[in-house]
Amino acid sequence: MSEQLPKGYSPRLYNQDLGPLPQKWNWYNIFAFWMSDVHSVGGYVFAASLFALGLASWQVLIALLAGICIVQLIANLVAKPSQQAAVPYPVICRMAFGVFGANIPAVIRGLIAVAWYGIQTYLASSALIIVVLRFFPQMAAYAEPHFAGLSYLGWFGFLSLWSLQALVFWTGMESIRRFIDWAGPVVYAVMFVLAGWIVWKAGWANISFTLSEKSLSGWEAFGQVIVATALVVSYFSGPTLNFGDFSRYCRTMKDVRRGNFWGLPVNFLAFSVVTVVIVSGTLPVFGEMLHDPIATVSRIDNDMAVLLGAFAFVTATIGINIVANFVSPAFDFANVAPSKISWRAGGMIAAVASVFITPWNLFNNPLMIHYTLDILAAFIGPLFGIMLVDYYLIKNQKIDVDALFDDSPSGRYYFDGGVNWTAVKALVPATLVGVAITFIPVLQPMANFAWFTGCFLGGAFFLVLARREQVRAPATLVTG
């Protein structure tokens, strides 16, 4: 890769994808980002699951509102440094972890995204196969596992979706912006039509906003509301950590905050209500409760409706996979060797890796996925805490943008050999606590709060160590 370096920038730290870029996005682009993230098969199943906790519908809505408002606050906090400097998350991490130490959080985040990218692609392809078999039942002979644990039909579905996602990604960030701008609204249109059809077939009297047979009350209900709130925050922890990769393109923080307001509390509550109407109505209409939207669509007695519904939800999956699991690892892997790995190359590394991990085998082995992803996820909370404490409390919201690309020993973010060991020292124990909460049986009741615990401990450890070791803070820098 040959490109002209800005003065003082190191080729080991800079390429055009990682450096500051023109900021053209407005609030609607951020709103569309969150629509693409929420409007997915996973989002549909998650929203429905909250109404099956045994809580009254108003209690679920309180939990949804509390959780999503916390997510909105975190998203605003995470967005600011990247919007201020116009650089992605792994570059912002250089402030806290050092210009080379930032590869630690970048690689961790990249590995999580690769695993989820493969799993999401596999789940969407499985749903697509349901629709294919609806129209071509004779192809059932090709649905038996054959190569590497996947059937011929499974390979066809997986590689088809894999290729579509890679094509959208390869066309560049501007094309991705245009894609997510219409993908979210398309899914909404299908959801509203599907909800209307379900209500028409079932009758409004048969629609219930409680999807569980059990009913909680008193302190038991209060505790479950707190758990539901924590689940909402945990569900959005991945895309929220990635959010700086998108807020960097925004013109102002006002655009970011406005987009977050419409995309998170307003959009998520509306999506959740429509979801529970559809799921509740499947019981009287089909005789069983269906939590998968594509399975619901495939039962409709109209071929055109099935095709349009399947198209909408496959589009939704492509949208969430690109914004949550494709763009971010592209930046993460490019950050490791900017002079050799472009953003596109980083994305394709993630895409190819997602095939080699055979996500269908990973997903079909709950123990393996539990150990692999939960251990990696234990890092997410502490990474939030360290980054936010560093930017807001240690650096006082000041960034030396040029120093983010300076690998000289005198560089502001060079620290000790390019690594700020204070951040590493804070990350390790906070992560170990998260792993302990996840895997030690006696601590299992705290598992739903692992993100909060990790975030608090990571930030607290870093603040104490940074103050003690007197990590130097920037003086006269770019402020926003």
Positions of PLM-derived features:
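Selective recognition of specific alpha-helical transmembrane segments in multi-pass small-molecule
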Residues: G42, A66-I74, I108-Q120, P185-W200, ...
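Membrane-interface loop-to-helix entry segments
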Residues: I108, I119, S125, F156-I198, ...
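Transmembrane alpha-helical segments of multi-pass small-molecule transport proteins
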Residues: L133-W170, P185-L194, V225-F243, V266, ...
